Amino acid sequence: MGKNSNISDEDILKEETQPGVVVYRSNVPEGAGVFDMDIAPGIKEVTIKYDLLMLGCEKSFPDVEKLIIGEDVVSIEILNTLFPNVRWVLSMNYEFETGSYLVYNHFGFKTLLNVFCRGADETIDLGDIDSIDNFAFKGCESLNIIGGEDIKDWQAIEQDAFSESALKSQPFQNGIKKAGHIIVDIDYTADEIDIPDDRLKKIVFSSDINFTKIKKLIIHRPETVEQINYQCGFPDTLVLNTDLLMHEQDVAGVAHFCTSKTYIKNFSVLSPEFKEIDGIAYTMNGKKLVACSMGKEHVIIPDGVKTIGKYAFANCHVKSVIIPDSVTEISESAFSSCSNLETVIFGKNVESIGDKAFGACVNLKSVILPESIRSIGNYAFFRVGLKSVQLSEGLLKVGIGAFAETLIKSIELPASITDLTVNCFSDMVEKITIPSFRKDICVGCIKGFRPLPSNDTVMKLQCGNRYLYIPRYMKPSTINEGIDDIEAFFANPKKKIPGIWSYAYTATCKQNMAFLEYVDFGSESAKAYLKKNAKKMALRFMEYDKEELTVRLVKTGLVSQMALKELLDKAEEKGMSILKSYILQCLNDSKNPKQNFYI
């Protein structure tokens, strides 16, 4: 008896469920399923009254031709060999289907559990089956499979679905073994595998196929690449050979189908519309670069290409790209998420950089944009590792978030700029230089919501020979007034002292702004605010070990004598000897000269 070893003999319930059929199950509720059974010879019809949990059972009842599933059954786990000759299943409940096979129905999603042991001359119709369970075809000799169009992809096929069946043991034909439209095995020794997909024929791969062992895979529909079990990797080389009409993004989508760890190194396309040269796909006239193979590291784009298409290099492992003078347009997301990209040399005639064109290129540290550039799209360099960018005269527009979340600290804008959009610069920017003030520069730099502590920064805005400091965040209720005051300062050459510090969103930023405005411009309102908050500022500076900054604050003479005594103890505790010396000097000297500095 194939009982569970954890079940003692006294826990076994033996029951004759119908004449000639005896089942054995545990009397423990959680183990109440049938783990063994005996069926007398000659019985052709068996009613399953309880859950049947007999995957490990080696018995076989070849006389049984029909199963009747009772209304209380929710789980049946058996091998085909238990009832090899069953040809009809009658279900009395909604969990299982009535039909030629054992099919589990989960809210309309149908999983093939068993086809039983079909002969070589029998046809298996998968009909409206949605998925195939492990060992569903074990012991089956039939190679005649039809239907199954509802089986959408490899995720619907368990790894051992076809194990120990004729479908798995059949000889390779053209390097593959098929079960209807499902490819169940591939000859890994073949130099290339040509998949028999076409305009009207969808192919699904079994989930156990290891694509990393395939040297070269040829497909004929773009959608076929999505059938690859990416968890098992990708073939080294993939060829899209098709006469179908395709969008350029379809080609790029095939070339760049990947995971974070695995990808198709070499891609080629054979098509009436596209051609491939040295691992890069172009339109047939060669004027648009459509898709680069993900394995290429250094690319010199040939002269004659006018456009770098959408997603042409997206997610590629390219390290350097040289763009020829013939290129005038870099399209949306053309280089997005190229995490290895370090160098881009732009041609002299690039006019536009599309939205998200270089987004998330984290290793791209510096770019020099040519004088031909007229527009930089939304988020074009978003989350790029840029530390410096050179913008040339002739640039007209910088899009939304174009340089957001970069590492750029200083940027010079040309006089030709006519359109600066929302949040186009990173919070890391400390200084922006522009020949003359434009109101929209504030839109590009100042945000109207509460900042994170790490983003609560001050920026120096240099317009011609005048400058002031602006907070990167203002309250929504005062942001318009603050921007008007910034504009008024630059519009009136006679106005020498700005008062922008009060518009800062947080108290911390107000303190920093007031500090700068008092030291650089002698603002009396800033001075009054500093006197009230000097002790708080000094303690904050000391908490973050900014000794030099604390010294500069002390030297303004705005820290009270009582506060200085408290700071002296703190300086002693923190081991700040230079600060300690200045505090002692200030305590003994009422004259404390001001000193220029920057935060």
Model-derived regions, located:
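Charge-dense, extended regions
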Residues: 578-599
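Boundary/linker segments of alpha-helical solenoid repeat arrays
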Residues: 561-568, 594-596
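Conserved hydrophobic site in ankyrin repeats
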Residues: 552-553, 583
